[in-house]
């Protein structure tokens, strides 16, 4: 569907238009999520919060700040199924990713939930 048609469809149908998420933001979400998975033992023992899988939303509620310094994410994680089962998270991670989304700039926290 052409961009103009999508815009017209959204306007006339009363549906909200989706915000565009930059490629750098998508890379940043993926990098932050994969860093946390690898560092915390792999998917067999650790799964980040569901917001970290929402690349179309740029990280959703996990994205705390996006500016010229890059992307700052704060999210929890736990054993596989922790959110679906309603159990407590076992980790909390604060990670800053470069503005281009390609480098972990700083991990200010990766420990027990605060």
Where are the regions that the model predicts?
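A short, surface-exposed interaction/processing loop segment used at functional sites
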Residues: 88-114
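Bacterial N-terminal signal peptides that target proteins for export
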Residues: 1-4
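Exposed beta-strand-loop-beta-strand "reactive/processing" segments of non-cytosolic proteins
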Residues: 48-96
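Short, non-transmembrane alpha-helical segments in secretory-pathway proteins
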Residues: 18-57
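Residues embedded in well-ordered secondary-structure elements
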Residues: 8, 21, 62-64
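Cleavable N-terminal signal peptides
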Residues: 6-7, 17
